[in-house]
Amino acid sequence: MAKLIVYVLRLGHREVRDKRVTTHLFLAARAFGADRVIYSGRRDEKLGESIEKIVETWGGVFEIEYQKDWRKTVKDWKSQDGEVIHLTMYGLPIQEVIAAIRQSHRDRLVVVGGAKVHGDVFELADWNVSVTSQPHSEISALCIFLHELFKGKELARTFENAEKRIVPQAKGKKVMRRKSGKFRPN
């Protein structure tokens, strides 16, 4: 079976106001198993540069893309038989729908809001999913959703072509750096 694709669509990025939140959302998406992030709102070249540096240093394949028209992105995804999952505090509880979402063999576009989310998102989504029905960040909702989707397997993922790797320690820090194709202590 081919690997399922998971993309994250960040709605309504605002360059000055959302810079840190959007960057953290993208880092979380990468760490928790998404293949790519797409964002709408204000184009921000520095976002791409920041994420590219992380991928160079810590490895893996992860892409960032800007799309001005989020509706077109969602409609194109659906027209290619992709599934759209909108994370919202108003949706169905994750614990009630995650098994059905996992059973789908369609590629997934996980939509997370920024500022006020347009009502069309709720109608276009195949799933409106809540991670608690309480206000919290889109970052925490995305992390919990991806963790549940992948059943925790994303936590043991290895990122290929990394320049650095962490060696887990009970105390202290240990980082290995790639030198001459092999990892050696820093």
Where in the sequence are the language-model features?
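Long, contiguous hydrophobic alpha-helical segments, chiefly transmembrane helices and signal peptides
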Residues: T22-L25, A34, Y39, V111-V112, ...
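RNA substrate-binding interface of SAM-dependent RNA methyltransferases
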Residues: M1-M89, H147-L155, K182-P185
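Structured adenosyl-cofactor binding patch, chiefly the S-adenosyl-L-methionine
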Residues: V121-A170
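Long, charge-patterned amphipathic alpha-helical coiled-coil/hairpin "stalk" segments used as oligomerization
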Residues: G91-V131
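Long, charged alpha-helical interface segments
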Residues: A170-N186
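A residue-level signal for beta-strand positions that form part of recognition/binding surfaces
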Residues: I5, R108, E163
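Short, well-ordered alpha-helical microsegments
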Residues: L47-G48, R71-V74, I94-Q95, H118-G119, ...
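Short, glycine/charged-enriched secondary-structure capping and boundary segments
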Residues: T22-H24, E52-I54, I98-R102, L124-N128, ...
